[in-house]
Regions:
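Membrane-proximal soluble regions of multi-pass membrane proteins
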Residues: 2-7, 14, 18, 91-120
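Cytosolic-side membrane-entry/anchor segment at the start of a transmembrane helix
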Residues: 1-51, 175-179, 184, 191
Length: 201
C-alpha cells in the first residue's frame, strides 16, 4: 500500500492514547496530526462519528471540528487548524481510548484497498469543492439526527484517505456516499420532526 508520510492513518490513531498529554484539548489532537496530509486529519477526526460513546456528545464536537477544518481547507494551501475557542475544548478520556483502540481496526481495511489512481479526480482545482462536501458532512454529523452520523462519517473517512493516498476512485466513491448520506439524513430528520409533531398534536 502506498502511504502519505511515514505512518499510515491507522498507525497514527493507534498511538493517540500514548501521544496526547493528560487532560488533552482538541488543539492537542490537531497538533499531533497537523503535519500529516489534511485528508488524514479529517479521516481521523471523523472516526468518533462512527464509534459512539454513551453519554459523550462526540458527534456534536467532532462534527463541528470537521466543519471548521474543512472550511479552512477550501482556501488553497491553507493549513488545517482550529480557532482558539474551539481548540480549548477538553477531550474526554473515554473518547481518546476508544479512538486509539477501535479506530485502527476501522481504518486498516480501507487503507489496504487504496492505491494511487484516477489522478484527474484529485486536481488542485477540485480540492475546494471536495472540502465543501466534507464541511457538509461535518454539519450532518453535528446535527442531532437519530442514526445520522454513520454514513457522513464513512464518507469523510473514505474521502480523507483517498485524498491522502492519491486514490481518485475512493474520492469518487466518497462523493456518492456523501450524496446518499445527505438523502438519508434529510429523510431521518424529516421523520423525527414528523414524529415529534404527531406526539404534540
Amino acid at each position: 500500500m502506498t502511504r502519505e508520510g511515514p505512518e499510515a492513518a491507522s498507525e497514527i490513531v493507534a498511538r493517540i492514547g500514548r501521544s496526547l498529554p493528560p487532560h488533552a484539548r482538541l488543539h492537542d489532537l490537531v497538533d499531533l496530526l497537523g503535519d500529516r496530509a489534511g485528508g488524514i486529519l479529517l479521516a481521523v477526526i471523523a472516526i468518533p462519528a462512527i464509534i459512539p460513546v454513551p453519554g459523550v456528545p462526540l458527534g456534536v464536537v467532532f462534527g463541528t471540528v470537521l466543519t471548521v477544518i474543512a472550511c479552512r481547507m477550501v482556501r488553497a494551501g491553507a493549513r488545517p487548524g482550529l480557532p482558539r475557542w474551539l481548540g480549548q475544548i477538553h477531550l474526554k478520556a473515554p473518547a481518546i481510548m476508544l479512538l486509539s483502540r477501535r479506530g485502527p481496526a476501522l481504518l486498516r481495511p480501507i487503507e489496504h484497498r487504496l492505491r494511487p489512481r484516477a489522478s484527474l479526480l484529485l486536481a488542485g482545482s477540485i480540492r475546494p469543492p471536495l472540502a465543501l462536501v466534507m464541511a457538509l458532512m461535518g454539519i450532518l454529523i453535528a446535527l442531532p439526527i437519530p442514526f445520522g452520523n454513520t454514513l457522513p462519517g464513512f464518507a469523510v473517512i473514505l474521502m480523507g484517505l483517498g485524498l491522502a493516498l492519491g486514490d481518485g476512485l475512493a474520492v469518487l466513491g466518497a462523493l456518492i456516499l456523501a450524496a446518499l448520506a445527505t438523502g438519508v439524513s434529510v429523510a431521518l430528520g424529516w421523520a423525527a420532526v414528523a414524529g415529534v409533531a404527531q406526539l404534540l398534536a
